[in-house]
UniProtKB/Swiss-Prot annotation:
One of its GO terms (cellular component) is nucleus. Residues 387-415 are annotated as: Leucine-zipper. Keywords: Activator, DNA-binding, Nucleus, Transcription, Transcription regulation. The lineage of its organism: Eukaryota, Metazoa, Chordata, Craniata, Vertebrata. Efficient DNA binding requires dimerization with another bHLH protein. Binds DNA as a heterodimer with MAX. Residues 141-166, 206-274, 319-344 are annotated as: Disordered. SUPFAM superfamilies: HLH, helix-loop-helix DNA-binding domain. One of its GO terms (biological process) is positive regulation of cell population proliferation. This is Transcriptional regulator Myc-A. Residues 319-328 have a biased composition (Polar residues). It is found in: Nucleus. It comes from Xenopus laevis (African clawed frog).
Length: 419
């Protein structure tokens, strides 16, 4: 027969199933139903206005037998959570047991709005329920640590660790007698609450908690479905995962060995010393303006000799660079820059010498040793044009002379014939 949601049941375990869905028009009915289940606190109506949905439980309730007179530990825990709102108590279980200030913060909302009498009552109830819960936690931890130590350690990548393998017989037995078995024999509280509440519990079940912290908490559906699987499949999965780990470790070791071998083999290579380009001295000649005109021929010949020596040095440097070993990019750039500077100096010196030679050929600026390059070019152009005119004039004169010569030869021949 289905239970009616309007009337609360006598059994406390079915209260989560009786909570209706929250709709906009059913808000007053929902709060009215909660007031029937338990007496409201003085400030409960104020806090209900700020809530939307009831907080769901973290784990499914393990229902005890209806014939038992005394409720189990899980039932007492649910009574405390539902009496205090559920949300803040569940947050306090995650914290350490020594943090009593955080546990006392449960009654902060009632202390703000109501008097100290309600706060004292709530503190008393919470302290009693938490003391009983911690005692049951110690007993369950001691009982769960013994099968964990007897079993071999499973693979670290397998999420259902020793808590999931407490006893397969117990899980099958709980499926037959669901309402007759107590909750502590079926579910370990550390599966639902992965964080330890006491130092003694953490020390007792340290090898099991290390495996739990690596994976997220196991839900009730996943634990029940995994308990139905065969142990042979689990062993095969563990073996496959262990093989994968061994392969990865061997690959890492081989890679590290290769790096070490390469580091040892590097000093055996011949060390190539970088080629250093010697700076050749290219003299920047300044014209001796105070010298006499008779020294110009010697000056030009000495300049040509020095330029030839500089060209020889540059050829030697280029040959050495071709025969040298490869170098780094920085040294190559420096060498190229130095070579470019040397060649640029040589080009400038050759250009200056050519201007000096051109100036000596132009009669108008030959005596002016301080003549600028622009004046030298203009005078040289004019002098070239005048030379071309003289050449054409001389060509015409030679042609006239040739014609006159032919005429004289003919006259001489006529005179010889008359004689």
């Amino acid at each position: 027969m289905p239970l009616n949601a309007n009337f609360p049941s006598k059994n406390y375990d079915y209260d989560y199933d009786l909570q209706p869905c929250f709709f906009f028009l059913e808000e007053e009915n929902f709060y009215h139903q909660q007031s029937r289940l338990q007496p409201p606190a003085p400030s409960e109506d104020i806090w209900k206005k700020f809530e939307l949905l009831p907080t769901p439980p973290l784990s499914p309730s393990r229902r005890s037998s209806q014939s038992s007179l005394f409720p189990s530990t899980a039932d007492q825990l649910e009574m405390v959570t539902e009496f205090l709102g559920g949300d803040m108590v569940n947050q306090s279980f995650i914290c350490e047991a020594d943090d009593e200030a955080l546990l006392k913060s449960i009654v902060i909302q009632d202390c703000m709005w109501s008097g100290f009498s309600a706060a004292a009552k709530l503190e008393k109830v919470v302290s009693e329920k938490l003391a009983s819960y911690q005692a049951s936690r110690k007993e369950s931890a001691l009982s769960s640590s013994s099968p964990c130590q007897s079993q071999p350690p499973p693979s670290p990548l397998k999420s259902p660790s020793c808590h999931g393998s407490l006893s397969l017989g117990g899980t099958h037995r709980s499926s037959h007698g669901f309402l007759q078995d107590p909750s502590s024999d079926c579910v370990d509280p550390s599966v639902v609450f992965p964080y330890p509440l006491n130092d003694s519990i953490s020390n007792a079940s340290s090898p099991c908690q290390d495996l739990i912290l690596e994976t997220p908490p196991i839900s009730s559906n996943s634990s029940s479905s995994e308990s139905e699987e065969e142990p042979e499949d689990e062993d095969e999965d563990c073996d496959e995962e262990e093989e994968i780990d061994v392969v990865t470790v061997e690959k890492r070791q081989s890679a590290s060995k290769r790096v070490e071998s390469s580091s040892h083999s590097q000093p055996s290579r011949p060390h190539y010393s970088p080629l250093v380009l010697k700076r050749c001295h290219v003299p920047i000649h300044q014209h001796n303006y105070a010298a006499s005109p008779s020294t110009k021929v010697d000056y030009v010949s000495s300049k040509r000799a020095k330029l030839e020596s500089n060209i020889r040095v540059l050829k030697q440097i280029s040959n050495n660079r071709k025969c040298a070993s490869p170098r780094s990019s920085d040294s190559e750039e420096n060498d190229k820059r130095k070579t470019h500077n040397v060649l640029e100096r040589q080009r400038r010196n050759e250009l200056k010498l050519s201007f000096f030679a051109l100036r000596d050929q132009v009669p108008e600026v030959a005596s002016n040793e301080k003549a600028p390059k622009v004046v030298i070019l203009k005078k040289a152009t004019e002098y070239a044009i005048s030379l071309q005119e003289d050449e054409r004039r001389l060509i015409r004169e030679t042609e006239q002379l040739k014609y006159r010569k032919e005429q004289l030869k003919q006259r001489l021949q006529q005179l010889r014939n008359f004689v």
